[in-house]
């Protein structure tokens, strides 16, 4: 499949830090490439319709996020964690988390409490560290396909425009913050 692949580079990181917004786009650590779509037991194949560009994605691309974040993410990776997909003709929002159950691990205390966003095993198990969009083993939404477990797929009601539905993940983050 075709995908935009992010590959971190220390020289590019320091160049981007130095040049700031004047950093030439052609030097971004991002390239269009043909990448294989892995097979994973228990994961479904979801065709990507749209994927957002988050501030965290831009921070990576323009050198605002330091390479020290790598213990929580794994690269090179197909970015994109705000994902609107299509499954069997229906639109679905894809939750990008890769918590204990996704990693084939027994639930950690946070996952047992229903706090999967605070999973203590985000860097453990057979999958590389990180969530969809920041994981070298599973591609994010800047590719043609993603893999997700059925529990991570949330149906979008008919009639909701795709350009709005793609904001399901950031909306969920806001609502979660308001409910705390």
Regions found by a protein language model. Name each.
Residues 70, 81, 99-180:
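NAD(P)H dinucleotide-binding glycine-rich loop of Rossmann-like/cofactor-binding domains
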Residues 36-51, 66-113, 152-159:
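Glycine-rich beta-strand-centered segment in the early N-terminal region that forms part
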């Amino acid at each position: 499949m075709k995908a935009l692949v992010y590959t971190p580079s220390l020289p590019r990181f320091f160049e981007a830090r130095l040049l700031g917004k004047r950093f030439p786009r052609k030097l971004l650590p991002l390239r269009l490439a043909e990448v294989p779509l892995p097979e994973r037991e228990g994961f479904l194949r979801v065709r990507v319709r749209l994927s957002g560009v988050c501030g965290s994605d831009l921070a990576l691309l323009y050198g605002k996020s330091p390479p020290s974040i790598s213990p929580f993410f794994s690269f090179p990776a197909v970015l994109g964690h705000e994902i609107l997909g299509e499954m069997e003709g229906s639109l679905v929002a894809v939750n990008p988390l890769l918590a204990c159950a996704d990693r084939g691990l027994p639930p950690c205390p946070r996952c047992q409490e229903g706090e999967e966003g605070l999973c203590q095993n985000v860097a453990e198990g057979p999958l590389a560290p990180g969530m969809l969009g920041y994981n070298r083993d599973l591609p994010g939404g800047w590719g043609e396909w993603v893999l997700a477990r059925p529990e991570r797929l949330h149906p979008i009601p008919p009639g909701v425009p795709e350009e709005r539905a793609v904001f399901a993940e950031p909306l969920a983050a806001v609502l979660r913050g308001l409910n705390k």
